[in-house]
Regions:
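A glycine-rich phosphate-binding loop feature that marks nucleotide/adenosyl-phosphate handling sites
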Residues: 90-93, 148-154, 243-245, 333-349, ...
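Ferredoxin-type iron-sulfur electron-transfer modules in oxidoreductases and energy-metabolism complexes
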Residues: 592-624, 628-700
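Flexible, glycine/charged-enriched surface loops at secondary-structure junctions
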Residues: 9-17, 21, 33-39, 228-241, ...
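N-terminal flexible segment immediately upstream of the FAD-binding catalytic core
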Residues: 1-73, 77, 89-118, 286, ...
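Mobile "lid/hinge" segments at catalytic clefts and subdomain interfaces of large enzymes
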Residues: 131, 135, 152-342, 358-364, ...
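Polar, glycine-rich mid-to-C-terminal structural blocks
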Residues: 180, 188, 207-224, 228-232, ...
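N-terminal glycine-rich flavin-associated loop
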Residues: 27, 50-82, 100, 104-148, ...
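Terminal amphipathic helices with adjacent charged low-complexity linkers/tails
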Residues: 327-442, 481-483, 644, 649-659, ...
Length: 700
């Protein structure tokens, strides 16, 4: 896509710290929100829920779209990168960058619900928990339900094209986006929604100085020139968020957009139009800054029913996923024997896991939405009758070979129909992450290939091959989460504080990406590309579509200033030649790397009965943001000071990050014992121990 000579992509300049005071002076009068470029604020936004850390240039907390526009326009003129951010719950590192961070979560979090049209118009910083709280007053809900939805923001859900455990029914966020208000790379405020292809043809101009006109030209070229390649290279999956959402564009243009549950074509889908708001879904803030969105809502289900099926092995459970889907569940979740063993040893989960037969090596949690209680019981009864019991076999003409006829894999089943019983089963399923992330050792269960999506018919072979990869690299992992749509969360145990561990990280990712391509999958089914997976998009989609991604990026963002490095790699003039060279290195900017150091500067007075002692506890927070939520949506106690102040520095995550930063050299060495650190970071902690109880990692 050609662009005007005045807007050619630039080489990213190195930002000089001496420029920071001038930036503060320039930005402060431009906005009504807060401008924070101090060391504490920058360190607070250097991490998210991923394995990555990158210190931002500074942070702005906007109060309005006008604030956002002013900041983006200033940064465009001065060639400074910009990063939009919500709750900072990204698992792939897409919400950390050397940029001016726009934190929408502090002020831009309002929503209005229209029960007549079953839609919500909401600001980008509202959490999905708060949005659903407002929608529930009208018997409605926002369908996509990411695990940390009560803490993650709507803008992040759009940027990530998020979904969750119930994607079998609700699909991804892009299905629900009707319209978005955005700030383009030059600060222009514009709205994207449905547009006729003929309008793209009439208004598009690849040489214009108007970014929107260049966008129209780029989208039209994709629709006219790249449909066949998109059809050929995009995985045929409901759960694919790798790369840009080009297949959604093609579906819109053809009038073949599927329903959220994949059961047919959306009757509202008409050929000849595309919804450019859907294109922004999954773009991770690299194309435009979303400030507000109108999204469709769904009626809340009348009731639910749950069956818990037990299996002799993980592979048996994987074989059973496809037949279970024939029963129309809303969720099919898996836990393997690794997690079950760990759960049995954890006091908080011991009673729940104790309900299972002793020889259980894997479980599938199968949930149904039902019209009423009787309907729910019948759905479970039909499932159990079909999938649980003795293996049925038939002998073929070849008496040496026994084949199965409608084989029943599950060895045992339990049912839950009232809310308390269902919650017990789900508690066991959700035990996975807390157990895995509570390690205080240097080796940790890291998210980097935890989100691959595979066609369910290929799950058994894929899992077996994945286990071989782990064996080859001398490590282990647990397989858990969304078996129904083929998205298994796998976090290998890796010590990135060693050079060998970093090599192991990249080696596993390379081998697993090969498996994903072989089995027709995607490297990301819900968590996005970010720093962890951008490197592999070139292998997944091929050179031609990789080039299309980069051309589209240039049309939207001519100077490549919006969250640079994510989805389509580095700047064009820095792009290495040849497919063997990665355009983005997943091993850069790791939170824990071979160069990482930790020094308290004092001997702790208390003894810590865990691996790595005090250091292990300081490094325990993985950044999920579970401490950032109101009582009404997150429950529990954690964290009362954040709930009162709504300031990151007063969250458990904020305190943990700054404490670690003071001991690893990110802050001045004398900072830890200084009066400012005590007053700002530690003194307002009320000592309630809510974090120790509620934090999934057990941060104290």
């Amino acid at each position: 896509v050609a662009i005007s000579a005045s807007a050619q992509p630039i080489a990213m300049r190195v930002f000089d710290a001496s420029e920071r005071p001038d930036l503060v002076d320039d930005l402060t009068p431009l906005v009504d929100g807060d401008v924070r470029f101090d060391d504490y604020s920058r360190q607070l936004y250097a991490t998210d829920a991923s394995a990555y850390e990158r210190l931002p240039i500074g942070v702005v907390l906007p109060r309005s779209t006008d604030d956002v526009s002013a900041v983006v326009e200033y940064c465009f003129e001065h060639e400074i990168p910009v990063l939009p951010r919500g709750g900072g719950t990204s698992l792939a590192g897409q919400t950390v960058n050397e940029a001016v961070v726009l934190d929408f979560s502090r002020y831009m979090d309002e929503a209005s619900i229209d029960p007549e049209t079953e839609t919500a118009t909401a600001e980008a910083g509202i959490t999905l928990g708060k949005l659903n709280e407002a929608a529930a007053e009208h018997g409605l809900t926002f369908g996509p339900d990411p695990a940390w939805g009560d803490k993650s923001a709507l803008g992040g859900a759009i940027g990530n094209n998020s979904t969750g455990a119930h994607s079998l029914v609700y699909g991804k966020t892009d299905y629900y986006i009707e319209e978005v208000e955005t700030v383009l790379a030059d600060g222009t405020v514009t709205t994207f929604g449905e547009v006729e292809i003929e309008t793209l043809r009439e208004a598009g101009d690849p040489t214009s100085d108007d970014i929107r006109e260049r966008i129209y030209a780029s989208v039209l070229e994709i629709l006219e020139e790249e449909r066949a390649e998109i059809d050929r290279r995009y995985p045929r999956l409901k759960r694919n968020v790798s790369g840009y959402n080009l297949d959604a564009l093609v579906e819109d243009a053809r009038g073949t957009r599927p329903l959220a549950d994949g059961t047919g074509t959306d009757p509202d889908s008409e050929a000849g139009t595309v919804n450019l708001a859907r294109l922004l879904a999954g773009s991770e803030g690299t194309l435009a800054v979303v400030t507000e969105a109108t999204v469709a809502l769904e009626p809340e289900p009348e009731t639910k029913a749950v069956a818990l099926l037990t299996y002799d092995s993980l592979l048996d459970a994987m074989e059973d996923v496809a037949p279970i889907l024939d029963h129309g569940p809303c969720a099919v979740e898996v836990m393997d024997d690794v997690l079950l063993k760990l759960a049995r040893d954890a006091p908080e989960f011991e009673e729940v896991v104790g309900l299972l037969p002793e020889d259980t090596h894997s479980v599938l949690l199968v949930e149904f939405y039902a019209d009423d209680a009787d309907h729910g019981r019948q759905q479970v009864a039909d499932l159990v009758a079909d999938r649980v019991g003795n293996v049925e076999t038939e002998v073929t003409a070849n008496t040496n070979r026994v084949t199965t006829n409608k084989r029943r894999y599950a060895s045992h089943a339990m049912e839950a129909h009232d809310a308390e019983a269902r919650a017990t089963f789900w508690k066991m399923r959700k035990a996975g992450m807390p157990i895995l992330l509570s390690r205080t050792s240097d080796a940790k269960h890291i998210s980097f290939i935890e989100d691959c999506a595979i066609p369910v018919e290929n799950l058994p072979a894929y899992v077996e091959a994945f286990q071989d990869v782990l064996d080859d690299h001398g490590t282990n992992a647990s397989f858990y989460a969304h078996a129904g749509p083929g998205v298994l969360h796998v976090r290998p145990l890796v010590d990135t504080k060693t050079a060998e561990g970093v090599d192991q990280l990249e080696g596993i990712a390379a081998d697993v990406t090969d498996l994903v391509v072989e089995y027709g999958g995607s490297v990301s089914g819900e968590h996005g590309d970010g720093r962890a997976r951008t490197q592999w998009n070139r292998k997944l989609y091929g050179e031609r579509l990789w080039g299309v991604f980069r051309d589209l990026k240039t049309a939207f963002d001519p100077k490549w200033l919006l969250n640079p490095g994510n989805i389509c790699g580095v700047l064009p003039d820095e792009e290495p030649s040849g497919t063997a060279v990665a355009s983005h290195d997943m091993t850069e900017d790791l939170r824990f790397s071979p160069s990482y150091e930790f020094e308290t500067g004092f001997d702790p007075a208390l003894e810590w009965a865990n691996e790595n002692g005090f250091q292990g506890m300081v490094e325990l927070c993985h950044g999920c943001g579970g401490c950032r939520g109101p009582q009404s949506t997150t429950g529990g106690v954690m964290c009362p000071t954040y709930r009162a102040a709504e300031e990151e520095i007063q969250s458990t995550r904020g305190r943990a990050n700054l404490l670690r930063s003071a001991m690893n050299g990110s802050l001045d060495e004398d900072e830890l014992l200084g009066s400012e650190f005590g007053a700002e970071v530690m003194d307002l902690c009320v000592g309630c121990n809510g974090c120790e109880v509620d934090c999934p990692s057990g941060v104290d």
